[in-house]
A protein has these predicted regions:
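Glycine-rich phosphate-binding loop plus the immediately following alpha-helix
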Residues: 6, 12-40, 48-119
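Short, structured coil segments at secondary-structure junctions
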Residues: 6-7, 196-198
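A glycine-rich, Thr/Ser-enriched phosphate-binding loop motif common to dinucleotide/cofactor-binding enzymes
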Residues: 22-32, 146-157, 216
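Glycine-rich beta-strand-to-loop/alpha-helix junction loops that act as flexible
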Residues: 52-55, 175-185, 217
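A contiguous, well-structured pocket-lining segment that forms one wall/lid of small-molecule binding clefts
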Residues: 90-174, 185-197
Length: 249
């Protein structure tokens, strides 16, 4: 391809096609890299990697084996927050969650939105798209109040999904490690953290001296290496693929 010709290097691409051909959804592909990070940093299991990009997704790591990984989308991550900011300001996002901290959440609207989301999520399997969500439910609120309500909505969806999906006893501990751009939204992180029971703790990936801004690029570099070695990159419990599959060209 063009990039390979320009660089005079082998370039691996098209990671998702084989997964889709084998009945998978083509995403997420980062879970095996999440497992690598857990292994390298000797983090106790079970552990949950929460990736907050446009869509929020979870990787549950219960053992060292990639076959045991469980991963799925939980709902909106930054998508609603960023869209609200773009509609009302010249900015692309609410830096550190400053504007949402000024606002006041509408509990009535929040509860209605959560009920509506439950109806949507019951119809989905593993994957969401940004087009699954819209801002209509906060349309009448001020900029700050709308943003605060959206932060709490996003946090509740993430929190509820973790509790529903990861069954742990009261005396068991679970660590949630957050990566993705949403980890920088202090308002969102605070809203998630305050809802978690005492046996579930939340840290960001940077706490482990790993630069969270490069997780995705590092993940695909790792996938490229596995692809070149003809090693599996997706599993039934991560993409809903029919069988463990290699990927990339």
């Amino acid at each position: 391809n063009l990039l390979s010709s320009l660089l005079k290097k082998e370039v691996v691409y098209n990671f998702r096609e084989n997964d889709i051909l084998n009945g998978g959804q083509g995403a997420p592909l980062a879970p095996i890299f999440h497992n690598l990070l857990i292994n390298q940093n000797q983090i106790e299991r079970p552990a949950c990697v929460l990736n907050v990009g446009g869509i929020a997704n979870i990787t549950l790591v219960v053992s060292k084996n990639n076959e045991d990984l469980i991963s799925f989308d939980v709902g909106p991550g930054n998508c609603l927050l960023d869209e609200w900011v773009r509609r009302h300001t010249q900015m692309k996002y609410d830096e550190n969650g400053k504007a949402s901290n000024i606002g006041k959440t509408s509990e009535v609207i929040l509860n209605q939105a959560i009920d509506n989301f439950d109806n949507i999520s019951n119809q989905k399997k593993l994957s969401f798209d940004i087009k699954d969500f819209d801002l209509s439910f906060v349309k009448g609120l001020s900029y700050e109040d709308g943003l605060s309500t959206l932060v709490d909505f996003t946090a509740v969806i993430i929190y509820q999904s973790i509790l529903k999906s990861i069954k742990i006893r009261e005396n068991e501990k679970l660590l949630i490690i957050v990566c993705g751009g949403g980890r920088k939204n202090l308002s969102l992180m605070g809203s998630i953290r305050k809802r978690l029971p005492k046996n579930i703790s939340l840290k960001i990936i940077d706490d482990y001296k790993i630069d969270g801004d490069f997780i995705e690029s590092q993940a695909f570099a790792y996938l490229a290496i596995r692809s070149a070695l003809k090693k599996v990159i997706s599993y039934p419990n991560t993409t809903n693929v029919e069988k463990a599959s290699i990927g990339g060209i």
